[in-house]
Structure formats: structure tokens, C-alpha cells
Amino acid sequence: GTTVEIDVKRNGETMHFTVERSEISMPTVQSAMAGDDIGYIHIFSFGKHTADDFRDQLASLKIAGAKKLIIDVRMNPGGMIYAVTDVANQILTKGTVVSYHTKNGESESYDIEGIEDPLPMVVLIHKNSASASEILAGAVQDKQEGTIIGENSYGKGTVQAVFDAGEQKALKISIAEYRTPSGKTIDKVGIHPDIEVSQ
């Protein structure tokens, strides 16, 4: 990568450093066995590598004997739509995961091929589970393929677009809203858990 020159003044003395820039990869998925046959997967956000990391860790948990899943999206602010639909494709049956609807009546659904025999699962949510994490929880709940446990989620269900405003400025506006497979609105409502547990 490229380098940057940094001067640090400490105790009256100036020290000069040349630092090489590099990409920092932050893991978005962590997993562990939570019992003899229970796999636990924590998804911190839905980014570029999330679906592949989820696939690898889910496979490892199955090899370790996981026959049930706990998927934790607490404190998950969301992320990329393709990442959450790819994760859903690995754990849910065929069908719609989410749809979006514009004010002028246009809509599009995100469908998956899915799997034939999903593992029994619970999804943990709370007040800071937002956007893509709510899409996953909403799909699990609407398809009745797992139990949602925790607190009502954040309620961030809008689609944004960024427009170049010139002079190194941009305008980000909401252009549509997400809905669960059954058509429930997420925005300002959130996902209500099947079992409420305050955290």
C-alpha cells in the first residue's frame, strides 16, 4: 500500500514515522458450540464477506455436531441487502426474504432458493438490531422457521440512495421501504419478538 508520514511530539521531542496503509479486515461473523448439539453464530454486520464467513462457520458447527442454531443479531446495525439474502439462503426454505416498495407503487422482492430442511433455530434481537438484521429476523418469523427472542428491534426499514451534489458533497435520501415476506412494514415499527426478554 501507500505510505503516510506522521510526526508525533512527545515530551518536547518530535518523532518521525513512515506508516504503510493497508486494508483492515474486521470479522463480521463469530461462532462457537453452545452445547452438545447447539451452534451459536453472532453476526456483527452484513458486509462483503459476511455470507462466505457464515457459510464456513455454519459448516464447521455442523461438523462439530450442531443440530440447532442460535443466530445472534443483537447490536447489528445492518448492512448490504445481498449479504443478508445470501445468509438467509443458507438457513431458510425457498421463497421471498424481503421486498421493497416505493411511494409510486413500484416493488421488488428478493427471493432465495433456500434449503429443504432448515435446522431448528432461534434469532436473538434487541433495540439496536436494525436494517438487514431486521430483514433476517422478519423472514425467519414470517416463514415460521425459527423463534425470535429478545426486545423489539430498531425499526430501520428504508432503502437509501446517494446522489452526487457536486463539490465533494452528496445527498442521501430514502427512496423505498422494506417489508417482511408477509408484507409487514419494518420502518419505525421493528420486529416484535415471539418471546420477549429484556436485556
Question: Where in the sequence are the language-model features?
Answer:
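Cleft-lining beta-strand/loop regions that shape enzyme active-site pockets
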Residues: 1-156, 160-166
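Short acidic, Pro/Gly- and aromatic-enriched capping/linker segments at domain boundaries
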Residues: 165-177
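Generic structural signal for well-ordered beta-strand positions
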Residues: 15, 186-187
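Short, acidic, Ser/Thr-enriched surface-loop or helix-capping motifs
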Residues: 180
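Conserved helicase C-terminal RecA-like lobe
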Residues: 188-199
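Short hydrophobic-aromatic micro-motifs
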Residues: 41, 171-173, 186
